């Protein structure tokens, strides 16, 4: 195995996880903040807002998991070797 390919794969795996978690992290923070603001404005709609928030957080977290899958594929099932 070429050491240059191995090193590039490790760097790419780190970048995949790092960059894949930036967007969803910002989105989750914004969504949670807006949900808290909405519940503060309309306390009677707490259940509906919370349900929608949890569903949207799950979809956002899926993007991070996709980045982790790409990183694991680069680490253990390297297609470039």
Curated annotation (Swiss-Prot):
The keyword Disulfide bond belongs to this UniProt entry's keyword annotation: no
Subcellular location: Plastid, Chloroplast thylakoid membrane
Site positions per UniProt: Reversibly protonated during proton transport: 61
GO molecular function, one term: lipid binding
Thylakoid is among the record's keywords: yes
UniProt membrane topology term: Multi-pass membrane protein
Gene3D superfamilies for the chain: F1F0 ATP synthase subunit C
Any one of the GO CC terms: proton-transporting two-sector ATPase complex, proton-transporting domain
Entry function: F(1)F(0) ATP synthase produces ATP from ADP in the presence of a proton or sodium gradient. F-type ATPases consist of two structural domains, F(1) containing the extramembraneous catalytic core and F(0) containing the membrane proton channel, linked together by a central stalk and a peripheral stalk. During catalysis, ATP synthesis in the catalytic domain of F(1) is coupled via a rotary mechanism of the central stalk subunits to proton translocation.
NCBIfam families, per the entry: ATP_synt_c (TIGR01260), PRK07354.1 (NF005608)
Name assigned to this protein: ATP synthase subunit c, chloroplastic
Source organism of this protein record: Angiopteris evecta (Mule's foot fern)
Lineage: Eukaryota, Viridiplantae, Streptophyta, Embryophyta, Tracheophyta
